[in-house]
Amino acid sequence: MANQPISAASASSNGHPRAHVSTGGMAGSHSAHGGPIGPSPLAGHIERIPVTVYSSSSDASRAVAAEIAELIRSKASRRQKAVLGLATGSTPQGVYEELVRLHREEGLSFANVVTFNLDEYWPMDPTALQSYNRFMREYLFDHIDIRPENIHIPDGTVPMKDVHDFCDRYEKAIAAAGGLDLQILGIGRTGHVGFNEPGSARDSRTRLITLDRVTRMDAASDFFGEWNVPRKAITMGVGTILSARKLVLLAFGEHKASIIKRAVEGPVVAQVAASFLQEHPASRIILDPASSAELTRFKTPWALGPMEAFGQKWDAHNTKKAAIWLARTLEKPILKLTDEDYNEHGLQELLSTREGGAYDINIEVFRSLQKTITGWPGGRPTDAGRPDGRSTDVHAAGVFPKRVVVFSPHPDDDVISMGGTFIRLCDQGHEVHVAYQTSGNIAVWDDAAVRHADFVTEFCRE
């Protein structure tokens, strides 16, 4: 089913999570086909913000875009403005692409929409490649019928002496528009929403802020080096964001999983600005399987209670998952895990499923992992000595040699990330092709290339 969430948590009218309602299936695992999976009712005691997990980021983006479209149409039917708070970056990009499609194919009008963007680097020319102003125009504003006067984006060119007054006017403009009906948010590795870095106060308003080093490191690739990333930005404050009537935070990808866990299951602390969403009566977090992987209901579902109570069982997948988790937690080899280790870490139920206790579990998991290790990444040739040409080797290949395509984001990622596998495939007779997804020419500044060319020219003359 399109845009179908895997699992969701709901919130009461006062913003505190209610117990999750099971929708069938197995909790604590992700759907391979996009169907709904209900989490444990006990997860609501751990997750302090309502969370919905979709089978893919594209499904999640379409669902959020549909919600925005419904808000716009509802407001238009009452001759009212829909006031949206917007975010930038790769996370909401899919939402904007879907909104553009709805405008072009289904006639969704943005004539009654007023927008306020969360933030902008400072200083920043609005036409620069890294400008959020340019981003919004390229991905949304230039493709819809929104009125130019209804677009509000922090000005990265305002002089330092005028920044305070600009921020004050930005706050007043939001209030004059009637406040934000819906605020879209992303989350950074530091837990920032907007550019509200660790330490931001709950009642902070739109202001100039100094960026955290982690934030600047994460933006380095966009600026061709960390040293080129602006050190400051203008951002809506936490208080400004929490003043919106509804908040929707999106996070996709495994690199967001750890900070999502802190924001959703941890306490409200200024060091994780996103945790303040726990105090909002109508906030939600939208995730894909990768970004939800660290949540208790997915990573350690046994911590929520008996597995059978929420449709789970101790099958091979969950047994391996638990043993690996325990080994990593205790920093012990799997074969050295003891009955006491399992007992003391909430895995008594798993222990009781094996007559030999920890020994049986350890051997089972160790052997399953051992089978995945091979010196033949493309599979071994079949055994020509057998009448059927088959082999009893678990790594035997039905097709040998293979035609292999390696997709590499940049011209060096293939050898850096999988050089050993690459050379094994070639040495073992497979036909290997590499598809580079960018030429790499934009990864180097023009002046750096010219400087190197000048050096080579002078060197050759000598």
Name each region found by the language model.
Residues N112-D119, A251, R284-P289, V434-Q437:
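Short internal beta-strands
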Residues N112-V114, L118-N150, I442-E462:
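Glycine-rich phosphate-binding loop and adjoining beta1-alpha1-beta2 segment
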Residues Y342-E462:
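Active-site rim/loop-helix segments in enzyme catalytic domains that contact anionic ligands
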Residues A2-R48, A270, A274-Q348:
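SAM-dependent methyltransferases
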Residues R73-E105:
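Glycine-rich N-terminal segment of FAD-binding domains in flavoprotein oxidoreductases
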Residues N112-V114, N150, K246, A282-R284, ...:
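Residues at the starts of beta-strands that form the adenosine-phosphate
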